[in-house]
Amino acid sequence: VSELHGTRWRSRIGGLVLVLVALTLPLVLSDFWLQTGLFVMATAIGAVGLTLLVGVAGQLSLGHAAFAAIGAYVYAWSTGESTTTVSGAGLPPLAGLVLAAVVSALVGAAFSPVAGRLRGIYLGLATLGLVFIVRHLLVNLDQWTGGFTGRSVESFALGGFSFSNSDPDYLAVAGVEFEGLHRLWYLFLVLALVACWLAGNLRSGRTGRAWANVRDSETAAAAMGIGVARAKASVFVVSSAYAGLAGAMLALAYGRVAPDVFSLTASVDFLVMIVLGGLGSVGGAVVGALFVTALPLVLAEYSGSLPFLAAPGSGGLDPSTASRIVYGLAIIAVLLFLRGGLAGAARRLRHRSSRSSPPAGPAPHDPISTDDVGRPAAVTPSRSKETTR
């Protein structure tokens, strides 16, 4: 028991330290790193939603970017003002943020009957179709979306406080002037922490165990009284809501929305994040988002200092191509040597360190166990300790 409590306390202390570091980073980071951090926190929320769907519930999705696009454009339309080229609802930004998640969740709920009838690669192909359908709508419904060029996004404001460089136009903390990027950093940090906390509770609770049973065996889950169709629908709704919120945050970080931002490549990027981080791991999804999102931005920023990189269009190895190569090598390395991703590797290191220490007593029964890749294990009937002759 003491070993279990010690592990939990170490995790909580480590999480608290990370939060404190994140709170102080805007005081020392440049605008480039602040912007990169905004992108990372936004994509991390999308990756967390996808790891619940793919890692915990076992439902393959190649259309996560479509739900993010819905959230981004719903936010842009709902908070924007009508002009001669595009329409807008003029709602408060907070209402637009909530509406982005809700509308994406409703689209996920509408798709859930399809998810209930398909599985595996067939479900993945069905979700892939969403990417092309949504892109077609974004390009052609130009009165609402702005067409190929997209539309601008209103800055976030809450209670008269603007998260841009105005109202108040000057705000300083510890001698550091807090401009729009600094203010958005704390907004995104709060949203990311709440989203990860909710996902962790879902993953370890009754809902997560139901999803895990459906992932492992739909027949066995139905025999245990779990509504398979209801479980699939619920995880699609939750995952879509996370993607919609991530899309709205990306719209705020970019200051503009365009169809090319939410292409098939973006869906693949989300999958790479959760595979590298570890399927079913909330923390792993965050780490994967950090790696996949920050790498191309960092390579582009410092391409002039890296001799093996060339400027885009010059015929050499540009930062985007280099990032794709690194992603591919990283995925191969994870699949071959790090089963369970980075989260699984960290978990094995903790287990080795705990085994090297003297035992504190018999290990308690953990009703929320995990499998060897860190996903919530399905609930299975216990076997009798007696053997038959």
Residue ranges and their predicted role:
Residues 1-389:
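Transmembrane alpha-helices and adjacent helix-loop boundaries
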